[in-house]
Amino acid sequence: MSKEFIRKTKESKPVVAICYDFDKTLSPDDMQAQGYIQSVGDEVESFWKESNGLAEENDMDQNLAYMFTMIQKAHGKVIFNKKALMDYGAKVQLFPGVETWFKRIRDYGMERGVIVEHYIISSGLKEMIEGTKVANEFEKIYASSFYYDKDGVAQWPAQVINYTSKTQFLFRIEKGTLDVNDSGVNDYFKPEDIRIPFRNMVYIGDSDTDIPCMKLINSYSGHSIGVYNPKTKDKRKVYKMMEDKRIKYYTPADYTEGSELDKLVKTIIDTTASNEKLMAVHYINKQEQVSHNGQIDNKEDKEKEKLSMDLEISHRFKHTHTIISELKKIKNSN
């Protein structure tokens, strides 16, 4: 029997989707380095050196390599099941203000007539993220995960997410087709029927792995924010991302009320509330014009849809970059 997918439909109010990387965006360090690596008697630096070496020597995806290395290192040392991974996740530290951030921003949105939804798009482990204190704050967690045998022991990757495949989840969020196996993400939607337009998306990340998502969101007038550790104040990565036009803004990863990030995101929500009123008028005018002319010229919409589908299955950065550039041309021609 085929699975019946639950899809989110367009709301009567505008929706803002805030999408987050996890490691070094919501947490100061890689999640694997906050308990798991130490439990198998390894050093953090040597673990990543071995994992990345495995990937390089075998033309292997780096994320598949770290997942394989985790399974191998656990043999005979620790139980490697979902509960154990969630327990490691419970130990993961979060940046200041993260625990109260999600509700606070949702509440602010409601005061402005805007629905705010939070999403994770991470190459880290879903099971560990599900073990954190904030797991229930997200509409959906898109992250790498394991397949478990009948005894509950991790055997094989069930899902792996790398820096280029991250972009497909933005399209799922855009259309409300959140299940990873829902082919409805390829369906055509009229612009006025899109649940969360890219212009109403915010992507918060810290490094190169976030660039494809940031670039895609930027190309459709969305909002990309680079964050850096507020303790070290090392801004080299955000400076580089700003120079390369990957981000529009950067702030410390301080999620407390009144922080730079707090004020910035609230300003984006305020802007969205005003802009969507204008867009509603635009769509009404457009529908009237189409009705008067008796036909719809949706050539550009169809071309955008084709490029979007190509982007969803792209696994190479160069190909992803080319597709996003073509999408941007369509946007700029409107």
Where are the regions a protein language model picked out?
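Generic structural signal for hydrophobic core residues of well-folded globular domains
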Residues: V40, T272, L327-K331
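C-terminal cap/substrate-recognition subdomain and adjoining C-terminal extension
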Residues: P96-Y119, S123-H321
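Helix N-terminus capping/helix-initiation residues
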Residues: E43, N81, T132, P197, ...
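Short linear interaction motifs
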Residues: M1-S2, I196
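Alpha-helical substrate-recognition element adjacent to the catalytic core
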Residues: S2-K150, M241
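Extended alpha-helical scaffolding segments
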Residues: R316-N334
